[in-house]
């Protein structure tokens, strides 16, 4: 496209966060950018586990919030955790109103599943492992019928338009070329960073574009070092790799090594139900020691596999693995980014005119390690809060804005980047590897003229090098201890390409501990 379009609100991204936000904005007009045909290539559609919500007998908002805080290893904002749990029931009602067919018990109540690090069964699912696909299908259908939404399919943002420190829309790229969308408010909802790693469960295009674009424009980004590696990606050499949902371990599946030994009890008392970072490191350790890792579902699921977990079953059978009678080979894979563009509790970033929600945002809800099945919930909760803030807000003037599109990364450099990120910024890291990675990425970024993927990788690696402790999804073999005081990390652009660490949360008057500064 070579046109200039205008709208009240521009939503960059068409996953769960972006689409649920767009629907709730009605009747305020908005444009939604979907880089692929609607419903395709969004990581939300691949989510197997479900949505966490404290709906069961004996469960509560306080318990859900406490589990979220515990999983986050000291960095979750307690007020945000409470907000997330408090809004969960209403967001489930939104999905039910759209016709999402969540699994139910014989009495008609919602079926609630147990997942790792949850103290109560509270995950609502669809046909075992089809939650993401079913939710996205319902949202896409509603979006196509919504008169206030203009959908641009096959179009992605490449840079944010800026005018006197205010974000004014985006420079976009589609099948017919580049164009401009001017907007009074712009929302980033583009997903994560898994495509920066060699083994990932994310779409390969998920390379941290929102982080790079926001940082380039001057927004504060935070907690970028915290990458969640899913412990049970199916190890069949696929790119991206399918995963074996957390719910399988919740149902009693065991992790075993080549000797058939269930090994998780050696690493954590919660065994298979330990938090994802703990399980991922255990699987990594077994594989590194040459003992391998398999998920044995034969006793817990067995012959019921096709009906209870159809997505996992199909992925296994396509690789000539029958999980009814064979253990599933597994390995950790880059799955979710806890960091992102820093926002307040209403989804506003540090730049006027710019909001963020979903995986590309850093809301304070995930800390150093996200609680299983909180990601879809967080997308909906903050998408709704942004919509509620913008729907009736006083309209600002449209601004012209300016931006320069960065070059695209070439295939050879991207392949090398993914290898380096997996090796030096993976499940286990150390200072020497991270320092070498920062040097390599910086040189590659300068040589290539600053592609967004390389900028995002440099920011992540720099944050990981700066954090000299082990916490949650960030594990340093040269600094295995956890500091007694938890601290989030915040970065902002310094000059054209430099990075400056902040000494305080941009949305809090309280300074960070002294060790948080560069």
Residue ranges with predicted function:
Residues 1-7, 24, 37-39, 47-53, ...:
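Glycine- and aromatic-enriched mobile tails/lids
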Residues 96-177, 182, 189, 198, ...:
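Conserved redox-cofactor binding core of oxidoreductases
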Residues 76-89, 123-141, 152, 200-208, ...:
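Short beta-strand to alpha-helix junction loop
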Residues 36-69, 73, 239-242:
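Conserved N-terminal glycine-rich FAD pyrophosphate-binding loop of Rossmann-like flavoproteins
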């Amino acid at each position: 496209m070579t046109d200039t379009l205008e709208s009240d609100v521009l939503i960059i991204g068409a996953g769960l966060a972006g689409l649920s936000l767009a629907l709730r904005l009605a009747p305020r007009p908005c444009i939604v950018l979907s880089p692929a045909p609607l419903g395709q290539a969004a990581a939300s559609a691949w989510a197997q586990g479900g949505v966490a919500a404290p709906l069961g007998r004996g469960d509560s908002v306080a318990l859900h919030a406490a589990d979220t805080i515990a999983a986050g290893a000291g960095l979750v904002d307690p007020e945000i955790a409470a907000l997330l749990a408090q809004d969960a029931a209403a967001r489930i009602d939104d999905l039910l109103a759209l016709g999402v067919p969540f699994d139910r018990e014989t009495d008609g109540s919602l079926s609630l599943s147990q997942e790792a690090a949850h103290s109560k069964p509270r995950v609502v699912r669809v046909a075992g492992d089809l939650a993401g696909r079913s939710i996205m299908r319902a949202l896409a259908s509603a979006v196509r019928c919504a008169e206030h939404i203009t959908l641009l399919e096959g179009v992605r943002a490449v840079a944010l338009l800026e005018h006197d420190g205010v974000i004014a829309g985006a420079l976009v790229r589609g099948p017919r070329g580049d164009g401009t969308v001017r907007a009074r408010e712009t929302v980033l909802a583009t997903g994560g960073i898994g495509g920066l790693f060699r083994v990932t469960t994310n779409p390969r295009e998920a390379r941290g574009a929102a982080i790079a674009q926001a940082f380039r424009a001057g927004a504060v980004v935070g907690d970028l070092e915290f990458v969640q590696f899913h412990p049970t990606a199916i190890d069949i050499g696929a790119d991206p790799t399918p995963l074996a949902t957390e719910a399988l371990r919740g149902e009693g599946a065991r992790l075993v090594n080549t000797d058939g030994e269930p090994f998780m009890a050696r690493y954590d008392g919660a065994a298979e139900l330990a938090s994802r970072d703990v399980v991922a490191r255990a699987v990594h350790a077994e594989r590194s020691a040459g003992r391998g890792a398999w998920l044995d579902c034969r006793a817990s699921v067995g012959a019921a596999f096709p009906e209870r977990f159809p997505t996992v079953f199909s992925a296994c059978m396509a690789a000539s693995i029958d999980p009814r009678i064979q253990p599933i080979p597994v390995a950790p894979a880059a799955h979710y980014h806890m960091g992102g563009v820093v926002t307040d509790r209403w989804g506003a970033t540090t730049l006027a005119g710019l909001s963020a929600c979903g995986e590309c945002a850093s809301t304070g809800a995930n800390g150093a390690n996200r609680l299983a099945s909180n990601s879809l919930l967080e997308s909906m909760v903050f998408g709704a809060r942004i919509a509620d803030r913008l729907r009736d807000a006083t309209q600002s003037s449209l601004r012209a804005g300016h931006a320069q599109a960065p070059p695209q990364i070439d295939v050879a450099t991207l392949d090398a980047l993914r290898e380096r990120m997996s090796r030096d910024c993976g499940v286990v890291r150390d200072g020497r590897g991270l320092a070498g990675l920062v040097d390599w990425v910086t040189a590659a970024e300068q040589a290539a003229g600053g592609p967004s993927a390389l900028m995002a990788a440099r920011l992540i690696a720099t944050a990981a090098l700066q954090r000299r402790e082990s916490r949650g999804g960030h594990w340093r073999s040269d600094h295995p201890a956890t500091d007694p005081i938890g601290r989030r990390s915040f970065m902002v652009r310094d000059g054209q390409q430099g990075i400056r660490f902040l000494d305080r949360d941009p949305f809090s008057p309280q300074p960070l501990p002294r060790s948080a500064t560069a």
